[in-house]
Amino acid sequence: MKKGDVKKVVLAYSGGLDTSIILRWLQDEYDCEVVTFTADIGQGEELEPARQKAEMMGIKEIYIEDLREEFVRDYVFPMFRANTLYEGVYLLGTSIARPLIGKRLVEIAEATGADAVSHGATGKGNDQVRFELTAYALKPDIKIIAPWRTWDLHSRTKLIEYAMRHQIPVPKDKHGEAPYSMDANLLHISYEGKALENPWTEPSEDMFRLTVSPEAAPDKAQYIEVDFERGDAVAIDGEKLTPAALLAKLNEIGGRHGVGRLDLVENRYVGMKSRGVYETPGGTILQVAHRAVESLTLDREVMHLRDELMPRYAKLIYNGFWFAPERLMLQAAIDQTQQTVTGTARLKLYKGNVSVVGRKAAKSLYRMDYVTFEEDTVYDQHDAEGFIKLNALRLRLGKMARDS
């Protein structure tokens, strides 16, 4: 695209140095009007400075929105109904935030008459894919500007020089290279790059912001109860909470006990491996509690089938296909499994660990009168003989055929 191709663009704007440089670059490169959009998804930053900075740079249309409840209710909770893990360990804290931001970019573009959207994701990572797949799925004719793929500002020195040349304030801590990049929302904080690029190097303890070191966690365990209704958490220790408030409280409780740290090397959609370190205290507790309630309330075959689908579902979210028809199809099936998942999990938190110590449900499939080791009157053990012989029939016939 060149000057004149774009009249108005909506920029995903954090107020930080990089997106402020992008803002000015868009104005210079395309001679277009820029609308800024800043989302509060629980990153824990004051957002008013983003407004002030945008105003200082001449922006007239500024959108700053609190999306925390929508983020947890419509994105995090649906994902957690599947006990979703990417590559067996990652709770997808970054991946699940991108569809909501991308959706609002498109909606604001439509509301303001903008013909393009722009983001600050680099050309090496997954986020560019997630933002753009979302935008194209919701508005096929949208134009997308990804500055990191087109400009020549590929070093910190060049970025700083550009900022100073255009009177963009440069915080003192931005003059040097940051030891790592950080992304935060209500579900997690992720750390990548620089000091973490060597996968053999242990992260510095002072990097972590949500969790204490397990060694420094309290010497006394804490017990909590989490209530679920139809697969979604609704209360902690009997206190009803909104989705965002519930996750925030679990973050605080889990962080205090060193719960939810993860260090992994993952396979990016763009083809390379990357090392990331994550803090997901509330999400870790939520998943363990959810699985505990499911153990009482989900039919065996339903649970096993859902668990077989989960890796594909996780891959779709990781790769940016939240609004794809196959994800929506899987979501409908997952949501159907959760109609009976109502109950309570009791958990023990101690020095980085989350242990299930109790679970209950009004409509539990667990029957003590059937599983007791004491004498019972409801289960005829003679029935097992025919069950075993029928299941063994093909094994016996196979052996007989091989021996003949």
Swiss-Prot record:
InterPro entries membership: Arginosuc_syn_C, Arginosuc_syn_N, Arginosuc_synth, Arginosuc_synth_CS, Arginosuc_synth_type_1_subfam, AS_cat/multimer_dom_body, Rossmann-like_a/b/a_fold
GO MF annotation: an example: argininosuccinate synthase activity
GO biological process: argininosuccinate metabolic process; L-arginine biosynthetic process; urea cycle
Assigned keywords, A-Z: Amino-acid biosynthesis, Arginine biosynthesis, ATP-binding, Cytoplasm, Ligase, Nucleotide-binding
Chemical reaction(s) catalysed: L-citrulline + L-aspartate + ATP = 2-(N(omega)-L-arginino)succinate + AMP + diphosphate + H(+)
Pathway assigned to this chain's UniProt record: Amino-acid biosynthesis; L-arginine biosynthesis; L-arginine from L-ornithine and carbamoyl phosphate: step 2/3
EC number: 6.3.4.5
Positions with a binding annotation for ATP: 12-20, 39, 120
Binding site for L-citrulline: 90, 95, 126, 130, 181, 190, 266, 278
Subcellular localization, as worded in the UniProt entry: Cytoplasm
GO annotations of cellular component type: cytoplasm
Keyword Nucleotide-binding found: yes
Broad class of enzyme this protein falls into: ligase
Keyword Endoplasmic reticulum: no
Family: Belongs to the argininosuccinate synthase family. Type 1 subfamily.
Oligomer and partners: Homotetramer.
NCBIfam families xrefs: argG, PRK00509.1
Protein name per its UniProtKB record: Argininosuccinate synthase
Lineage of producing organism: Bacteria, Pseudomonadati, Pseudomonadota, Alphaproteobacteria, Rhodospirillales
